[in-house]
């Protein structure tokens, strides 16, 4: 939102911005979550000229699909963040290059030879790109993917807890580094590791992605990739302005991380 507002002020635009957000993922009470998600039924889209959609934190796939279908029905231009969808304009960071750099850093500077990619949803746009970069590096290093697996789950903290708990309970050999698809999963792994007597980064290393506040203030501090959210917000406004001006806009656009 900060990036959106910055671009609006920079261009001195007369734009009214309305934000609809929910905390439907935060409770295990299904009825509570339904109530939270009801906020998406409030907007009268006939009063709007465009939509910026970020549903990366909506873990309920049926709810996510419901929102997407509703936006399709409006006929409005939609700029979607990290979501490939027919007729939407997708804006994304470079999910590929930073993982390549991170993997080489861990391999060359920290002598890591056993890896685990602690991923999110298998079909999520960002997760697919980051997992593909990870796989490329594993092959480049001459390692076997079955010995350096890719794990799939959600994008949340509890997924990281689950990954670590499974390693402990199944007495699996721990990797030199958990390459996490985001900082939430990294934090979950670190917390569960500490509960089981492990010390990060002494016993193994954990990396994140997104550069959330928790990466900076978490102990141990998590090595992470900076996701420039403000630039994404700024780019969303630029795309909508070009659409409103009748310009041709590519289906996908990228912002450097």
Where do the language-model regions lie?
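Flexible loop/turn connectors
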Residues: 163-257
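Glycine-rich phosphate/diphosphate-binding loops that line cofactor/substrate pockets in enzymes
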Residues: 103-115
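Hinge/beta->alpha junction and helix N-cap segments in small-molecule ligand-binding domains
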Residues: 18-35, 55-59, 90-101, 117-165, ...
């Amino acid at each position: 939102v900060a990036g959106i507002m910055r671009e609006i002020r920079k261009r001195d635009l007369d734009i009214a911005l309305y934000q609809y957000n929910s905390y439907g993922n935060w409770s295990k009470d299904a009825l509570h979550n339904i109530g939270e998600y009801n906020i998406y039924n409030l907007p009268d889209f006939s009063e709007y000229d465009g939509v910026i959609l970020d549903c990366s934190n909506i873990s309920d796939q049926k709810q996510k699909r419901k929102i997407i279908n509703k936006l399709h029905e409006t006929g409005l231009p939609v700029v979607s963040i990290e979501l490939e969808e027919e007729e939407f304009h997708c804006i994304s960071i470079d999910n590929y290059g930073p993982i390549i750099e991170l993997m080489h850093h861990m391999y060359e500077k920290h002598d890591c030879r056993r890896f685990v990619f602690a991923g999110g949803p298998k079909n999520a746009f960002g997760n697919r790109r980051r997992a593909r970069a990870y796989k490329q590096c594993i092959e480049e290093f001459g390692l076997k993917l079955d010995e350096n697996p890719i794990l799939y789950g959600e994008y949340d903290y509890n997924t990281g807890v689950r990954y670590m708990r499974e390693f402990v309970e199944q007495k699996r050999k721990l990797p030199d580094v958990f390459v996490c698809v985001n900082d939430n999963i990294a934090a979950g792994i670190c917390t569960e590791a500490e509960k089981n007597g492990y010390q990060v980064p002494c016993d193994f290393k954990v990396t994140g992605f997104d550069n959330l506040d928790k990466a900076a203030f978490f102990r141990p501090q998590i090595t992470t990739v900076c996701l420039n959210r403000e630039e994404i917000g700024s780019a969303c406004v630029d795309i909508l302005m070009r659409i409103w001006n009748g310009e041709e806009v590519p289906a996908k656009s990228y912002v450097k991380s």
